Amino acid sequence: MATYSSNDFRSGLKIMFEGEPYAIESSEFVKPGKGQAFARVKMRRLLTGSRVEKTFKSTDSAEGADVVDTNMNYLYNDGEFYHFMHPETFEQHQVEEKTVGDSAKWLQDNAECIVTLWDGRAIAVQPPNFIEAEITDTDPGLKGDTAGTGGKPATLSTGAVVKVPLFVQIGEVVRVDTRSGEYVSRVK
């Protein structure tokens, strides 16, 4: 892989740091009046998702991470692993439950997800930005009951719970933003 100087660090760049892949979220180059220049970097550890702040000298460098984001279709969950398939090569990957994490509540059969692979192993799963799911459970909205925020919790067919407007009923299909977990619209 390529080697990057700390001057080349940009948002979105994936590097190897302490033997693990990291994604740089922001980089600020600082040149103090006295002393050596440095880069103040905020990065996300791809294996766990934790965020780290690190300072690199201007002479430091890091190797690029051999990390690939691949579009894959979600197939099924066998209780222990989530199974994904590449749509063109039909190559299948099984992903541990802890790697999928909170994304599991947004997975629907055959949904196209972005699976991040490192050394052929899946290390992160990103569900589609928007899903359409049926409401399986919610309280009936009473007319004139808008004293509060005007929303009510609803359980989707995927198991996720989102806040929806009072007019939405059981059996309706709604569009949800998976990044924020918010209701977007009804699907007709």
From Swiss-Prot:
Q: What is its main location?
A: cytoplasm
Query: What are the entry keywords?
Result: Cytoplasm, Elongation factor, Hydroxylation, Protein biosynthesis
Query: Which SMART domains does the protein's record reference?
Result: EFP, Elong-fact-P_C
Entry annotated with the keyword Cytoplasm: yes
The Gene Ontology terms for molecular function here are: translation elongation factor activity
- A Gene Ontology CC term for this entry? cytoplasm
> Which domain of life does this protein belong to?
Bacteria
InterPro entries this protein is in? Answer: Elong-fact-P_C, NA-bd_OB-fold, Rib_uL2_dom2, Transl_elong_fac_P/YeiP, Transl_elong_KOW-like, Transl_elong_P/YeiP_cen, Transl_elong_P/YeiP_CS, Transl_elongation_fac_P
Location of the protein in the cell: Cytoplasm
UniProt PTM: May be beta-lysylated on the epsilon-amino group of Lys-34 by the combined action of EpmA and EpmB, and then hydroxylated on the C5 position of the same residue by EpmC (if this protein is present). Lysylation is critical for the stimulatory effect of EF-P on peptide-bond formation. The lysylation moiety may extend toward the peptidyltransferase center and stabilize the terminal 3-CCA end of the tRNA. Hydroxylation of the C5 position on Lys-34 may allow additional potential stabilizing hydrogen-bond interactions with the P-tRNA.
An individual GO BP term? peptide biosynthetic process
Q: What is the annotated role of this protein in its UniProt record?
A: Involved in peptide bond synthesis. Alleviates ribosome stalling that occurs when 3 or more consecutive Pro residues or the sequence PPG is present in a protein, possibly by augmenting the peptidyl transferase activity of the ribosome. Modification of Lys-34 is required for alleviation.
- Matching HAMAP family, A to Z? EF_P (MF_00141)
PANTHER family for this protein: ELONGATION FACTOR P, ELONGATION FACTOR P (EF-P) FAMILY PROTEIN
From the Swiss-Prot or TrEMBL record, give the protein name.
Answer: Elongation factor P
Q: Which organism is it from?
A: Pectobacterium carotovorum subsp. carotovorum (strain PC1)
Gene from which the chain derives: efp
